[in-house]
Amino acid sequence: MASKRGSNQDESIFRIPPYYYIHVLDHNDNVTKVVVGPKTYIRQDHERVIFGPEKMITIPPRHYCIIENPVVRNDTDQVVYDNLGQVKLFHADQEIRLAREPFPLYPGEVLKQAVTALKVVQANAALRLRAILDFEDGTQKRVAGDEWLFEGPGTYIPRKEVVVDETIRATIIRPNQAIKLRARKETNDREGTARVTGEEWQVKKVGAYLPGAYEEVVDTVNAYVLTEKNALHLRATRTFVDMKGKTRKNGEEWLINMADTDAHIPDVYEEVVGVVDINTLTNRQYCVIVDPVGPDGKPQLGQKKLVKGEVSFFLQPGETLEQGIQSVFILGEDEGLILRAQESFKDANAAGAVRQPGDRWMIRGPCEYVPTVELEVVTRRKAIPLDENEGVYIRDTKTGKVRAVTGETYMLSQDEELWAKELSPAVEELLQSAKDPVAERSDRRGDRAAPRAREKTRVISFRVPHNAAVQIYDYKEKKARVVFGPELVMLGPDEQFTQLSLSGGKPKRPNVIKALCLLLGPDFCTDIITIETADHARLQLQLSYNWHFDVPDKTDVAASAKLFSVPDFIGDACKAIASRIRGAVAGVQFDDFHKNSAKIIRASVFGFDEKNKVRERFLFPQNSLVITSIDIQSVEPVDQRTRDALQKSVQLAIEITTNSQEATARHEAERLEQEARGRLERQKIMDEAEAEKSRKELLELQANSAAVESTGQAKAEAQSRAEAARIEGEAAVDQARLKAEAAKIESESELQRLTNAREAETKYVREQNALEVNKTKQMSDIETERFRNMVQSIGADTIKAMAMAGPEMQVKLLSSLGLKSTLITDGSTPINLFNTAQGLLGGFSAKRGIEHVEEED
């Protein structure tokens, strides 16, 4: 052994402290001895210290250690040596040493387990011990492999023959709890009951339970608390006797409810299938239980049981509800139930009538009905209210006949059902589109809503617009009828619409227009045809035809049927008209056709009457279609060269016409100019004659005036001067009068202006003063209200304290300084020292009073 301290083995003197020791090897006899301190050991030459100095092992109270290969001691607890002086050892043995005086390890001894505290086992705990050697424990003999418990409270003293497998703690069993135990081998439980290996049992006693040595806790089982609204569904895992003393067979199922116990802890041989809720039925509910449990507790397989409310019950194991809890059928006057018998029984609701399996019948309201277990409810019927323009298709399930019921409220019987009438996809699309056949014949609008699905059991109705007709064919009667609008058409079960597939587009293409109703017109259609003249000029014409159907008597069945004799009357009419036009144009030169196109086309289409005049209409006798007029919208050559030549000829004709009109206008202008010149010369001659006549009269007047001048010149001068004076005086008077009137008008206007200005200014000042007074009044009211609110919010005592705070503070300050009066000023200010303190305090108080008065204002 090597020294743990790494001592220098060449040293000769070893100082061993108290409770220390060393191992010294004697090389002469190869014996190792122990030297215990306190001591100073002088090593001899033939000795070598192989271990130490090392501290002795000290075991405090309630501690222990394990020594391997312990020394042999005699009866007096002394170490035994052999004849060579070497200590004897129990090799491959162990010794457990408890609290004692410190001791050294002798050569060969090994400290297998250091000093360790003894295990203190608490209450409700135990140590599972297992014997690894045979030994006797007092009066009890233990065999290797035996197990037992050291139960607390206590301190466990270990033995070398025993090992501690585990610490077991007691399981706390609370109210409504139990623990499931299993025997690991044959043993007796705490109550002394013998248990075989693998057997399980329960302990329900409330408190702490400490499992035995051969017992193991499998699980803690909680009790199921039962109420009035739930029950516990149990199944036996083996045959046993339950807590009531009843034998339960393996696989048997049963219920435990509150009537049996408030809380149930499942036994070890009971398996909880689930918690079953109570089923509660009101007085308007019922249910059918399948495979009900009989009075003997056994299920009656294949039977049913009707339960009506008010009642509450639990479903027993094996029982099921057919379609769950159902409501009682409350039937009104317009409702009924279709019933079907499942088995033969007497119907108490029908005066004891015997119902055979498969029978169907109907009960009508008003009533309250609960179906029995012998029958089933097929369906619930409700009367279908129908207006005069509404209907439904009904089929008799016994005879297969289909009929239409309209204009009444109808309820299907037990042998009737709604029949769905199928239509072709094209007719379905036309019916669902809900377009107006007159106003919405085009599909160019892309914002149309999605079509609504048709209810196929409803009678198909179609509104025929004014001046239109619809043909309906009855495949059963093999007859057709034509209905003229405005009318509402309702199809019978075997009737179908005659669908129209008309040509459309420009030029006409077949099967473009789909329609159910035939418009009688008048209307127009436009077509583009290609013709060829006698000189092989190919032209393209765009023509528009006005058409209508000539139906003088709509009650005439034969005449009405002729309307639908031609499936595509547009295409046939356009083809017939185009054929006539081509035939007529084929024998005409291009120039003639170009000059007389309208006449040629009208004559070719309408033909001539007995007087060789063009007829006014073209009649198709097959379907009474009448063409009344033709509009030539455009004529264009098909060949490009012909088109260019025609354009040149048209330009040349325009130039010729223009030149002719220009020459005519020039000749007319020259003629008018000559006529105007002649009238002017004549007028000059007449003016000269008139001038000569006027000159003659002038000479006569000059002669008369000369005579008058010679005889009364003086008189005339006097009269003229008098008249001039008179006129001058009247003018001066009028001028003075006008000036006076002008001055008066000016003064009146100025007075009116000043009056208006003063009145306006006075009104403005008055309104401004009123506004100022109103503003001042409102401001004073606001200030008064504000001050009142401030006074109310602060309080009179607070205001008084604030007013007195300044003077009181000054008085207190002066009193604290011991001064009667104080004045602080500079050298340039004169001071009146009379009544100084009173003046200062009075001035301060007066200032506070002034401020207070201002605040009140």
UniProtKB/Swiss-Prot annotation:
InterPro entries linked: Band_7/SPFH_dom_sf, MVP, MVP_rep_dom, MVP_rep_sf, MVP_shoulder, Vault_2, Vault_2_sf, Vault_3
Keywords for this protein: Cytoplasm, Nucleus, Repeat, Ribonucleoprotein
IQ domain boundaries: 665-694
Keyword Repeat: yes
MVP repeat ranges per the UniProt record: 18-60, 62-122, 123-174, 175-227, 228-282, 284-332, 333-387, 388-441
Pfam families associated with the record: MVP_shoulder, Vault, Vault_2, Vault_3, Vault_4
Ranges annotated as biased composition (Basic and acidic residues): 437-453
Entry comment describing in which tissues the protein is expressed: Expressed in embryos, tube feet and coelomocytes (at protein level). Not expressed in sperm cells (at protein level).
Chain intervals for the UniProt region annotation (Disordered): 434-453
Predominant location: cytoplasm
GO cellular component: cytoplasm; nucleus; ribonucleoprotein complex
Gene3D superfamilies (alphabetical): 2.30.30.560, 2.30.30.570, 2.30.30.620, 6.10.250.720, 6.20.380.10, Band 7 domain (3.30.479.30), Major Vault Protein repeat (2.30.30.550)
Localization annotation: Cytoplasm; Nucleus
UniProt subunit comment: The vault ribonucleoprotein particle is a huge (400 A x 670 A) cage structure of 12.9 MDa. It consists of a dimer of half-vaults, with each half-vault comprising 39 identical major vault protein (MVP) chains, PARP4 and one or more vault RNAs (vRNAs).
Described purpose of this protein according to its UniProt entry: Required for normal vault structure. Vaults are multi-subunit structures that may act as scaffolds for proteins involved in signal transduction. Vaults may also play a role in nucleo-cytoplasmic transport.
Protein name according to UniProt: Major vault protein
Originating organism: Strongylocentrotus purpuratus
This protein's encoding gene: MVP
